[in-house]
Regions:
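Conserved alpha/beta-domain cores
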Residues: 1-80, 86-88, 100
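C-terminal helical cap(s) of enzyme catalytic domains, especially alpha/beta-barrels
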Residues: 86-106
């Protein structure tokens, strides 16, 4: 994670080398990319530094030859900030709200 959130969990940036090594040593896992969910901002432009940092991290891991497929996917960007994510190199988007509409609230 590139930031701490009480509502989200995941790997933190400092743990990435250890995680990459564990995946490399596994016979059943292959690292194919990185994903981030930045904080929600009314101004999507504020998500840019998070996307840019993940792109930088991906490029470094790719230079090291650590991605199983060699590419290193970047899963980042949702309905409200996907344009910024694309500009910062996203290869996978999560745009369910744009396709299916808002979720019903329980």
């Amino acid at each position: 994670m590139l930031f701490r959130s009480p509502t989200k969990t995941g790997a933190v940036e400092k743990d990435l080398p250890e995680i990459i090594e564990a995946v490399r040593e596994s016979e059943r896992l292959s690292l194919i990319g990185l994903m981030t969910l930045p904080p929600f901002f009314d101004d999507a432009e504020k998500a840019r530094p998070f996307f840019r940092r993940l792109h930088e991290m991906r490029d470094e891991i790719r230079r090291q030859g650590r991605f199983g497929d060699g590419r290193g996917e970047l899963s980042m960007g949702m309905t409200h900030d996907y344009v910024i994510a694309i500009e910062e190199g996203a290869t996978i988007l999560r745009v369910g709200t744009a396709i299916f509409g808002d979720r019903e609230k329980p």
